[in-house]
Each structure stands twice: as structure tokens, then as C-alpha cells.
Amino acid sequence: MKFLAVVSLLAATALALPNAGVVHPTFASADKYTLQQAQNKCGEHTTLSCCNHVSKVGDTTAFNYGLLNGLLGNAISGPEGVGILSGCQKISVTALIGVDDLLNKQCQQNVACCQDNKSVATGGLINIATPACVALDSII
């Protein structure tokens, strides 16, 4: 009976939430760069990609008190956050004739730079191997 009550409460909460509607990119770099500029910013050994899902990591809040105040600073995570992306599809730069076209003609979502090499995860309790994709705007 308790299980049914909890499930009903969760279902009612989910139905009461507002509709997300149109999803806008977290990192809106598609309007800033042409295809060639974006590929140059990604660099060698990476692939320009269009990604569905963003996990923004690295946002920190600094507290200016305590014994170890500022000892690590932003060494563990950056102050602005880095976008780690998944659900990515490769954008073919070489096959496109209009290299000077803006990225938004090819990608309406989040533009990222993904590793070319395959990720390998072995020897752990839980192994997950996914290619690392970082948002184009996260790259300096």
C-alpha cells in the first residue's frame, strides 16, 4: 500500500511539472563560429560533433573562511564549469562544400569536440567507456 502511495505521489508530481517545451542549447556556440573555425578550435585528434545531452561540471562556490581557505582554489574544478556531452553525432567538415557556413546550419543543439580514439575502461568494479566530448565554448 505504501509503495502504491509513493508511486502515485511521484506520478502526480511529474504530471504537475511544467512542460519543457523547446530545448535550447546550453552552450550556444553554433551562432559564433563557421565550420572551419570550429574545427580549428577543436584541434587535431578531435571530431566536431553535435550533441543532445550536457552535464555541466566544475561549477564551484568559494567560501572565504576556514583553516584551509583557498588552499586548492580552482585546482579541482574550474570556476565556470566544463560541459561534458553525450549523445553526439559527428559533423562532417570535409564533406561539406560550404565550410564558411555557420555551425547552426548543421547543428541546432550543443556543438562539441570529441576524442577520435576509442575509450577503454577495464579492471574496475563498474566500467564505462565513452568518448570524451567537451563543449566548444568550454575550450579556451
UniProtKB/Swiss-Prot annotation:
Gene this chain is encoded by: rodB
Position of the signal peptide: 1-16
Protein name from the UniProt record: Class I hydrophobin B
MF (Gene Ontology): structural constituent of cell wall
Task of the protein: Aerial growth, conidiation, and dispersal of filamentous fungi in the environment rely upon a capability of their secreting small amphipathic proteins called hydrophobins (HPBs) with low sequence identity. Class I can self-assemble into an outermost layer of rodlet bundles on aerial cell surfaces, conferring cellular hydrophobicity that supports fungal growth, development and dispersal; whereas Class II form highly ordered films at water-air interfaces through intermolecular interactions but contribute nothing to the rodlet structure.
Organism whose genome encodes this protein: Aspergillus fumigatus (strain ATCC MYA-4609 / CBS 101355 / FGSC A1100 / Af293)
Subunit structure: Self-assembles to form functional amyloid fibrils called rodlets. Self-assembly into fibrillar rodlets occurs spontaneously at hydrophobic:hydrophilic interfaces and the rodlets further associate laterally to form amphipathic monolayers.
Keyword Repeat set for record: no
Domain of life: Eukaryota
Covalent S-S links between cysteines: 42-113, 50-107, 51-88, 114-133
Phenotype seen when the gene is deleted: Does not affect the formation of the rodlet layer.
Family: Belongs to the fungal hydrophobin family.
Induction: Highly expressed in biofilm conditions and during infection in a mice invasive aspergillosis model.
Location(s), subcellular: Secreted; Spore wall
